[in-house]
């Protein structure tokens, strides 16, 4: 199966910030719809669904760690969460998985087989409950290293249309005319560039469309890309002082910016939210 279909991009904000985050993204011209609380009760989300059927997951922890009793299982689970130490902003991105939890056709088996080493951990079940009570289930395939810049995979057990409600069509229409994802721009240090390029190529199952010693680009697919331009995954080393400061301020490789294709008379240029950079591509 293909392992290069973009599913969603994760944007983290401070604990309990649902109303503030929703307001910020609506002010950017996005249509934000309710998501729900995840199965572990630690995180909740809202969604921005695009016409290419990729979505932004606006996620936050429901409580800060100190809200849980010291040494309690929930406190430990909160402190050990893969995103617990991540600063707010664009923190992760997911490709579409196949929903296989056990057996020989797991995403982890496919990628680890390509790599001839263990890049991905064993699959784990996931899910959340929507505000309307609908229970969603999926399977997560995640990189073995918690601070990896490699994508995780989300494979639906229940119907994806329940997780990503693209109907009614108004869910994917945005006042800013955003149509789909143009690019995800990853920044790494020069020392990490070559090894990261190799690992991403292994995950995608293809070499970059273009590559220099400072930048590589891969074309991704989406579930509704027939009438839309495809997104690009960009891996690069810092090209200016602002990008160098960004790399220096993050302990692990990170998403620098997300680009959006804009329709006619749509937004242009770039904007920085309180926690992430957005670029409009016409």
Residue ranges of each PLM-predicted region?
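Conserved catalytic-core motifs of GNAT/GCN5-like acyltransferases
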Residues: 32-39
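Glyoxalase I/VOC metalloenzyme domain signal
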Residues: 1-6, 11-31, 43, 50-282
